Amino acid sequence: VEKKQRHEIRRKQRRAEREAEVGFYLVGQEHNLEAEVDDFVVLQRASREDKADFMTPQMRRFFGAVARTMLDAGYLRLSFLTLNGQKAATLFAFEYDRKFLLYNSGYDPDAYSHLSPGWVNLSYSIQYAIAAGCRLFDFMQGDEEYKYRFGSQDYKVMRTIVSRAEVSPAEER
């Protein structure tokens, strides 16, 4: 992250901490996962119209199932930023093999937008990843501007499909 952007990120963090009671937490086994995923969905849908369109009832069920599986495996990193006790931003991510993989995010643009809750939550998540020993913070797909402000770099994403060819019994000999 360039020096100017580091300064801007720290400035946003300090402003939030000065103007509100800031909380940050990662969802764990002690939390009600279903309720936390519901809160993630509310914030994710509120953040942008295309995200609201993406989060169909079927996709909501998918996120719930993935969250349960990944939490039980120890990989889920569902974070929330609270401002004055109200959930203001969230990240749905995974930590695996010393990599922090950001899958989706959201924030409430109508509440505390002047405090940049999405940026602040992201900065706390990056700080967590560093403290946890992650060597890579992967923003994954998408070219949203904020990713580049946090130092994201493009890389090729390749898809490979492997299938087993049908072999007749005569060919197996």
What residue spans do the PLM features occupy?
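A conserved beta-strand-loop-helix scaffold within acyl/acetyltransferase catalytic domains
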Residues: 1-114
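Short glycine/serine- and small hydrophobic-enriched flexible loop segments
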Residues: 65-68, 124-131
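Short, high-confidence coil segments that cap the C-terminus of an alpha-helix
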Residues: 76, 131-134
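Active-site/acyl-donor-binding loops of N-acyltransferases
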Residues: 83, 134-173
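Conserved acetyl-CoA-binding loop-helix of GNAT-fold acetyltransferases
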Residues: 113-126
